[in-house]
């Protein structure tokens, strides 16, 4: 007796991808079940170099999905990463690939996780192309991701490249159940983000200015900041406290911080329970070591008694 599709799916869900590929060749019925599982989670990594400058895997995937539209609703997780070395030529050709992704990705309305890391795709000066961020070429028509819970957007940045526009704000405003957000290359605040947007957001990773524009009015309890410790100042730090729930977890391990920032954090964020810090002592080693210990103890005394974990990664 043939097993029902539900039973086959339950069995196939526990098999590795390599086995599913083999089973997909056994019969049309096995193929139908195995394909849906294989396409439920897509992870594409393109390594770009002077000898291979095109994100071919990404382009092949776009064409494959156009040939298999019945599998689009099966995809729950989509990750696309482009990695490049210094020998890679100027990425003008990547604009067309971003435009192609902008035609395909919006069709994945059942997505729960979206991770786009486009490497050098945005390393174009504004006068060479339309003033739109490379990632915005993909997300500008993504207005129906009602199930998206996790979103990560990033690309390499330098001076003179196309900045984010209100397309990003419109995209974020269309995500009613988003809980986890990472904006790794956004150095400014998100402009014109409606106050009612992202009502369920619980964690954010990005620059201090971006955090200061996103956290107010939202239930964020997990915050991870990137950049330089000087980017955290008395303008943006107070605004990070305007969350609807107290901040509990703060991760500063992506930046080397000085002791004075700990003092400011203890003043503005007394509800922090877990703090990850990469403490840069090289700025203070010309003082006596006992003085450093004394200052650090004084600063830590300001911190809330709610701390249950406190990690220091010392940079000498």
Please report, for each region that a protein language model flagged, where it lies by residue:
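Hydrophobic regular-secondary-structure patch
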Residues: 2-95, 119, 123-125, 206, ...
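Long, well-ordered mid-to-C-terminal structural blocks that present hydrophobic/aromatic surfaces
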Residues: 234-287
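Long alpha-helical scaffolds
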Residues: 34, 105, 265-269
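Leucine-rich repeat
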Residues: 52-63, 84-245
């Amino acid at each position: 007796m043939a097993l029902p599709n539900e039973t086959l799916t339950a069995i196939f869900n526990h098999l590795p991808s390599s086995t599913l590929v083999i089973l997909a060749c056994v019969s049309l019925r096995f193929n139908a079940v195995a394909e849906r599982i294989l396409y439920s989670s897509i992870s594409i990594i393109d390594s770009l170099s002077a000898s291979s400058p095109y994100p071919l895997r990404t382009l092949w995937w776009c064409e494959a999905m156009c040939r298999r539209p019945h599998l689009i609703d099966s995809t729950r997780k989509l990750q696309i990463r482009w990695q490049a070395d210094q020998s890679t030529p100027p990425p003008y050709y990547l604009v067309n690939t971003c435009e192609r992704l902008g035609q395909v990705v919006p069709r994945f309305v059942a997505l729960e996780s979206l991770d786009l890391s486009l490497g050098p795709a945005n390393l174009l000066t504004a006068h060479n192309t339309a003033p739109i961020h490379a990632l915005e070429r993909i997300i500008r028509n993504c207005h129906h991701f009602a199930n998206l819970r996790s979103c990560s957007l990033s690309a390499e940045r330098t001076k003179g490249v196309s900045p984010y526009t209100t397309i990003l704000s419109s995209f974020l405003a269309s995500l009613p159940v988003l809980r986890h957000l990472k904006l790794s290359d956004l150095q400014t605040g998100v402009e014109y983000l409606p106050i009612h947007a992202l009502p369920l957001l619980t964690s954010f990773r990005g620059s201090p200015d971006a955090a200061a524009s996103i956290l107010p009015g939202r239930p964020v309890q997990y915050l991870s900041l990137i950049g330089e410790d000087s980017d955290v100042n008395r303008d943006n730090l107070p605004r990070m406290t305007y969350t609807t729930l107290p901040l509990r977890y703060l991760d500063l391990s992506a930046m080397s911080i000085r002791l004075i920032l700990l003092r400011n954090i203890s003043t503005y964020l007394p509800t922090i329970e877990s703090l990850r810090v990469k403490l840069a002592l090289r700025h203070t080693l010309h003082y006596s070591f006992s003085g450093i210990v004394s200052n650090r103890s004084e600063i830590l005394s300001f911190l809330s008694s709610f701390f249950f974990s406190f990690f220091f990664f010392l940079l000498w």
